[in-house]
């Protein structure tokens, strides 16, 4: 079948790029022809001259990249951001089959729909109302073709009553629904009376060997721990991590921190390599937890320090399913090895269940097309 993935297109987010790749590879392994729709819901929130020029050049074009390279000569921060974006765009170009067109909220003609047999919505936080990009496009309401959601996430534990009808309309248009978190299951069940399947994030459907195939091969001279925080890291938490590193004779590498300029430039392929080579991981990120598990690393999860609704449900669901709830920093026994023989058995069971949902849903769609 010809399948279109509808997800968030974030060319600066590791988890987003890697889940997109993983879902594509999984669908292709089932014999499908897969493309990801470039779904640009809102224009860049840049202002002034830079925004106007980028609008004229077009989204994600090489001209836009050259424009950003020009601005990068004026500051080290812009230079680092430019290098980082190049790495993300190169990864996308080499590994993700994207449409040569884009759609947004103003699009009125969807001619490509004629060539699509089925849409798969997800994964990632495609249904998070707090994101400025969120719209009807995230339910593919523009098409009457069959729709499946795979590991779609709301990103939050509940939604405002004022949005209930908006979600009901969107969810009722999806033929087969699966979500990534238990909280998402409760939201869907409450809104439309359907109990969706809770499935694994696509990144966990691929094996360690699968990921190593697209990883960089850089070798590091010193043993290191990887620190990857999306929220602010407290003084106490970082002090704890420093003590852990010192007691084990490890150096610290910090991702997503401009204090480590080398790692700030890292793209998704470098991200994979760093997790494969790290001795331990300290994080508040869902996908950092996922890749720690994939590569069987010692890890500790910290509460994310940021303003806004809690996003812990996705981590809670994953850790609960794999009997790893003691990996929260506040609960874990420090330096105690993780029994990955047990964890991987549970992961394989969840993987079989998740793949079964996807295969069965696709088979039903294919039968309906051939009837």
Predicted regions mapped to residue ranges:
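Active-site anion-handling motifs in enzyme catalytic cores
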Residues: 1-371
């Amino acid at each position: 079948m010809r399948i279109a993935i509808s997800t968030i297109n974030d060319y600066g987010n590791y988890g987003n790029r890697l889940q997109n790749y993983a879902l594509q590879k999984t669908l292709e392994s089932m014999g499908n022809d897969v493309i990801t729709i470039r779904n640009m819901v809102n224009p860049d929130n840049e202002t002034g001259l830079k925004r106007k020029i980028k609008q004229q050049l077009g989204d994600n074009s090489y001209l836009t990249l050259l424009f950003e390279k020009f601005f990068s000569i004026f500051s080290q921060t812009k230079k680092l951001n430019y290098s980082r974006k190049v790495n993300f765009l190169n990864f996308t170009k080499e590994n993700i089959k994207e449409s040569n067109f884009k759609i947004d909220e103003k699009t009125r003609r969807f001619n490509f729909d004629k060539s699509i047999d089925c849409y798969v919505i997800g994964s990632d936080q495609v249904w998070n109302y707090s994101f400025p990009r969120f719209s009807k496009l995230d339910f593919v309401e523009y098409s009457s073709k069959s729709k499946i959601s795979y590991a779609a996430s709301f990103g939050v534990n509940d939604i405002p009553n004022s949005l209930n009808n908006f979600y009901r309309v969107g969810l009722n248009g999806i033929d087969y629904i699966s979500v990534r978190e238990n909280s998402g299951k409760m939201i869907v069940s409450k809104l439309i009376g359907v109990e969706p399947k809770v499935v694994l994030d696509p990144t966990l459907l691929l094996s360690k060997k699968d990921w190593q195939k697209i990883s960089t091969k850089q070798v590091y001279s010193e043993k290191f721990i990887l620190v990857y925080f999306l929220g602010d890291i407290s003084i106490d938490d970082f002090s704890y991590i420093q003590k852990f590193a010192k007691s084990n004779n490890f150096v610290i590498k910090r991702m997503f921190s401009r204090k480590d300029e080398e790692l700030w430039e890292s793209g998704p392929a470098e991200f994979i390599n760093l997790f494969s080579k790290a001795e331990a991981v300290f994080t508040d990120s869902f996908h950092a937890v996922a890749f720690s598990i994939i590569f069987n690393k010692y890890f500790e999860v910290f509460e994310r320090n940021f303003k806004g609704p809690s996003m812990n449900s996705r981590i809670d669901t994953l850790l609960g399913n794999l009997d790893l709830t003691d990996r929260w920093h506040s609960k874990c026994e420090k330096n105690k090895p993780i029994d990955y023989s047990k964890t991987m058995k549970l992961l394989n069971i969840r993987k079989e269940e998740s793949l079964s949902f996807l295969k069965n849903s696709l088979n039903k769609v294919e039968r309906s097309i051939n009837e």
